Amino acid sequence: MKKIVILSFLFLFAKLSFAESGWQLGATVPIGASFSFYNVYFSKDAPQSYKDNYRKNSGTVGFDAGITFQAGYLVTDEEKGISLLVDIGYSHDSFGLKSSYKDETTQQDINVREYYTFENMQIGILPKFHYNNFAFGLGIGVKVPLYLTHSAEFFNDNTSTKTFSYYDVGKIDDVMKNIVMTYIKLTFDYSFNIQDNVALLVGAYIGTDFGIDLRGAEKVLVESRNLASLDIGAQVGMKFGTTIGN
């Protein structure tokens, strides 16, 4: 299947390479929601109190935003085309988690809501398929965390306690075993050509961030502690260079 997709892409690119072509530059601002998924597996030596602290019942909604810059080349036959873009920028990604446990001392139920908020540099590629003013993209790349904020709020009856922890690029490995996360995204946008070689983009995206191993220093009692998300949102942007459509 993978070979068929690659061959189809190369065939279409070769077919269009004899048509009009040109460079494209652009910038995009995505804003959306993040739905988190969390899995943890403990070693056989982990005590129950330790498991209660690190086990999470479910994910909750986080917030994503950022700005990315694209540069690449478009080949087109005026109605349809293919572009291959480098996609570089900044992303703000938050992962929300919920859990609950019983305090061994007071025997009271404790509810916990926590967020891992990453400030990332991202780099990847974004091939796009164009038809008139519409474009569909499939992006893949990595995000490198530059700063991490971990916040947690503990609810007990009518009281709550908040904690915050901050990790710069030199200390993120206290929390993460790996130093990068992987992303995949599907994009859709519509171009409003406002003048020659300038277009306004309005669209949407759906994607996932994964490969986040939160073991950090907890490598003895935890065998794996993985965080991922499903991201959905809207995006606006501008592009400059060769365009398709009206």
PLM ranges: what are they?
Residues 41-53, 101-109, 158-171, 216-217:
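Flexible, solvent-exposed coil segments and beta strand-coil junctions
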